């Protein structure tokens, strides 16, 4: 009588992280660049670099060509505003779902429920390499605990999402990531889960994972000293007002944690209306102009074209439009970030 795998239909052996990296290796130039990007992000998060960290880009990437076109535009913009804003592009390949839905490029690269994960890993890593060669720092959400072994060497900032910030598995994983990590507050707006995560991620952990050769292993981490809070609003409403920022500062100070806060301009902070992201950016820039120093970053969901679309007909998708959360378009992004840089240039030193 069978006692295990009763609900498992199929198992597929994947390429190991070591094998994928051998097929798609990192050049020495990219290696040095990523190391430099991470150091810059660490310095901003630690409030040693006065620039604002802005993580911007598509909610998720489903079209490689559109992502590369977006990246080319973003690179030109980032060079223009680099004195005041350090731009990191969103390269999100995994999407957490409240119920069901498309889980991202790695899980389902063809958008047809075929779940060609081996292809998704290859496509994702190839794109990260190409974007890195353009000279862009990259950000992603660390969702599946195995995926970082395939991708994290090309990532300069990672997020732990609102649905997973409270997860022990994700806190342990984040303690071993090689880049700074932002923890979002809970979907209900609660700050405590993110604050607790900062304490956890800074500590060493031991947990089950996989090695570069794909073997199940006990992973022992040193702890990640560069965790920080990402305020994204919640069911109770937005949480980017001066009062919310001050409450977050007080909670961090109480536990002797660095007062370093990123504000997510989308999700509940925009009331799930992408057009309201500008209002969030304006509020935050006003707070910084008034002397706030704890706000070290912003997150903006942006694409080539505005809004979003359903994937019910994958062959009929509009180019450069999100298939997950709605985004602002490129012209709005360019205008918003240039305006932000101008405002930062005039802030008190």
Question: What feature does the model see in each segment?
Answer:
Residues 53-66, 325:
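Conserved phosphate/anionic-ligand binding catalytic regions in large, soluble enzymes, centered on
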Residues 2-5, 84-240, 244-245, 267-268, ...:
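Active-site-facing alpha/beta catalytic cores
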Residues 57, 263, 329:
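Conserved, mostly hydrophobic/aromatic
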Residues 64-76, 99-106:
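Glycine-rich loop at the start of a catalytic domain that most often binds anionic cofactors/ligands
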Residues 42-50, 253-257, 348:
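Glycine-rich phosphate/diphosphate-binding loops that line cofactor/substrate pockets in enzymes
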Residues 6-46:
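N- or domain-start disorder-to-order transition segments that initiate the globular core
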Residues 68-83, 249-253, 284-293:
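Short amphipathic alpha-helices and their capping/turn segments at secondary-structure boundaries
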Residues 303-346:
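Internal helix-turn-beta structural module
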């Amino acid at each position: 009588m069978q006692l295990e795998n009763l609900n498992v239909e199929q198992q597929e052996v994947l390429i190991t992280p070591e094998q994928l990296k051998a097929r798609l290796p990192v050049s020495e130039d990219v290696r040095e660049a990523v190391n430099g990007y991470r150091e810059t992000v660490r310095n901003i998060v630690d409030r040693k670099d006065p620039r604002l960290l802005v993580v911007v880009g598509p909610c998720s990437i489903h079209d490689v060509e559109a992502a590369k076109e977006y990246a080319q535009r973003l690179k030109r913009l980032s060079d223009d505003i680099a004195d005041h804003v350090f731009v990191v592009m969103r390269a999100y390949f995994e999407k957490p779902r409240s119920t069901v839905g498309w889980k991202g490029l790695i899980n389902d690269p063809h958008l047809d429920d075929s779940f060609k994960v081996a292809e998704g890993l290859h496509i994702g890593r190839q794109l990260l390499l190409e974007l890195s060669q353009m000279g862009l720092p990259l950000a992603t959400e660390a969702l599946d605990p195995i995926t970082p072994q395939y991708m994290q060497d090309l990532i300069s900032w990672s997020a732990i999402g609102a649905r997973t910030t409270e997860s022990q598995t994700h806190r342990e994983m984040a303690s071993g990531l090689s880049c700074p990590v932002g923890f979002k507050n809970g979907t209900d707006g609660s700050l405590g889960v993110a604050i607790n995560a900062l304490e956890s991620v800074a500590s060493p952990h031991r947990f089950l994972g996989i090695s570069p050769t794909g073997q199940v292993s006990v992973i022992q981490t040193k702890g990640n000293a560069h965790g920080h809070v990402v305020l994204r609003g919640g069911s109770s409403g937005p949480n980017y007002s001066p009062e919310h920022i001050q409450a977050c500062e007080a909670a961090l100070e109480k536990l002797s944690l660095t007062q370093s806060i990123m504000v997510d301009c989308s999700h509940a902070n925009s009331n799930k209306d992408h057009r309201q992201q500008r209002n969030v950016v304006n509020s935050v820039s006003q707070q910084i102009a008034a002397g706030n120093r704890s706000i070290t970053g912003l997150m903006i969901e942006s694409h080539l074209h505005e809004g979003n679309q359903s994937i019910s007909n994958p062959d009929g998708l509009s180019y450069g439009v999100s298939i997950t959360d709605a985004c602002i378009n490129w012209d709005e992004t360019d205008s918003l970030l240039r305006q932000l840089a101008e405002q930062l240039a005039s802030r008190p030193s």
